[in-house]
Amino acid sequence: MALACGSATDNTAAPGNTAGGSTIPGAGGGAVVGAGGGSASGPNASGGAAGGGVDVTPVGPCKAGVPVTTQIPLLLNRQYAAVVRDLLGVTAVGTTPVAELLVGDFTGAMTAPAWKVYQDVGEKIAKQVMATPDSKAKFISCAPTAADCLKTTIETFGRKAFRRALTAEEVAAFMTLNSATPAGTPDEVAEAILNAFLVSPSFLMIPELSTELATDNPPTAGAIKLSHQEVATRLSFLLWGSVPDAELNKAADDQLLGTKDQILAQAKRMILVREKTGEFISTFHSDWAQMNNSSAHWFKGKHDTAVYPDYTDASRVANKKELDAFFEEVAYTGSFKDLLLSNVAFVNKDNAVAYGLDPSKYTDALTKVTLDSATNPRPGFMTRAGFLSSYASYGSTSPILRGSFMAIWLLNVNVPAPDPSFALQTVTGDFKTNREYVEALTQKVQPCKSCHEAFNPLGFVMENYDGIGKWQTKDPRGGDITAATTTATITFASGPKTITSPVQLMQEIASQPAAKQLYAQAWVSFATGRSANENDQCTVDSLQTKLADDGYSILGLLGDLTQADSFRLRVRGSL
């Protein structure tokens, strides 16, 4: 049965509104138009963190008010994948993960090629669902030929897929597929309806179309109060990266998400669903640590096996899983400080050697271990094999990459991009350690010298960890790694300090107000899908103050993100 529905089944496209002039091509030559003057765009229409990632660009002092945000952001690929998993039980089409079938996350108006990809993916998913009994039952639980089965399916599945109840007009539009020509079998009609849902704007986007003005708080007067369903959607995508569950939908339909206390109560419940929130927490921290393959650092997943014979495809996979497990564990049991100081590791037979452990004592499954801080110092995520092997060169460590990450993302050091007109430097000599080589290379001329002085020392302290994260006392260049190799003078906000070990370095970073401020700002950026601005800075400042308390948990931070006025209000703007 040929599907030609496009926007015909979805009233998100409000007549007369053109989303600031941008349109999304619909199937069959139709057009899906943005609603209410919003922008039919990705999550970063205001120029924020690309791909729904994190951004820590300084924004200035706090200014009371609700920030202007995009009105109809597009689902990120990871969100799309999570939604079809939760609604339909689909994690892959064939053997390809759903997110990998889509175009890369983007900003701006939907393009015709991107729209064609969404149509193709929706068609493939719908076909697979109808051919898979368990997935089919999640979509349609009655016989398509039974009286009112299709209408009931449209209403019940549509409530979940659109994150709101469908209008009578929308239900009727979906029902027209039952009388389309040429006629299809009952299962083909059901498949066409599911396909139509998967390409509808209210599924692919997260529209916020409420118009009720908020008048309860003078600083937010004139802002628009989100509907209870819109608040539920914000909650679910913030904490789960997916659609609301039945309990959250019921709270929304019962009008029980209008106050901060009501929102926080639901947030606390949802945070405890670890299989959902834990995954989202790991995703944030991977983005924050620039481990999501979108950052510009040089590592592309390969190392010289002649130098590092223990590094394999299996160890690389284990390293990624370990980092995810580490981030989740610290979030559920610790604080920001623990991210930088915890000696907990997750080990299996593929990554055990990186921690000096016997691989034969482990299986494929990751096992939580607490490493001996005296004999196996591994403070925090930046000493995990996954991080260290990513922030490394093909055949050596990279103090430059490791140091620049710490400088930019934890210490708020302004590291400008290299001048593209400046020639890449080379240096020759009998260098016994990588530190000697890097110092000769980057201290040779200006502007290299002044720039690298800001972050190279941070990386030098980490030279006992080799290019794949193992502890080393001998450099691959032949020299011994001594205390002199790993000692550096580093200038913090309070002044210069001599740092002699990774543990001392992480303790110092964990105590820095800048590190807490940047971490809070990264969360705000990630949660909103855009760069933080001066209105968001008020929330950032509040979270930074709370992070100064070592007893303040990361889960507490998640709950507090839902308490900002900007979580339940929005302001119209031109984005």
Residue positions per predicted region:
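Ser/Thr-rich, Pro/Gly/Ala-heavy low-complexity intrinsically disordered linkers and tails
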Residues: 1-62
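Short, solvent-exposed loop/turn and secondary-structure capping segments
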Residues: 95-98, 167-170, 204-211, 215-218, ...
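Active-site-surrounding "flap" and adjacent substrate/cofactor-binding loops of secreted or lumenal enzymes
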Residues: 89-129, 255, 261
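Sequence context surrounding c-type heme c attachment/ligation sites in exported
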Residues: 352, 368-516, 527, 534, ...
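A conserved hydrophobic secondary-structure block that centers on an alpha-helix together
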Residues: 145-193, 201
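Short, functional "switch" segments adjacent to catalytic/cofactor/reactive centers
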Residues: 107-155, 465-520
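A cross-family structural signal marking well-folded subdomains
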Residues: 87, 198, 239, 249, ...
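Mature N-terminal segment immediately following signal peptide/propeptide cleavage
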Residues: 59-60, 66-95
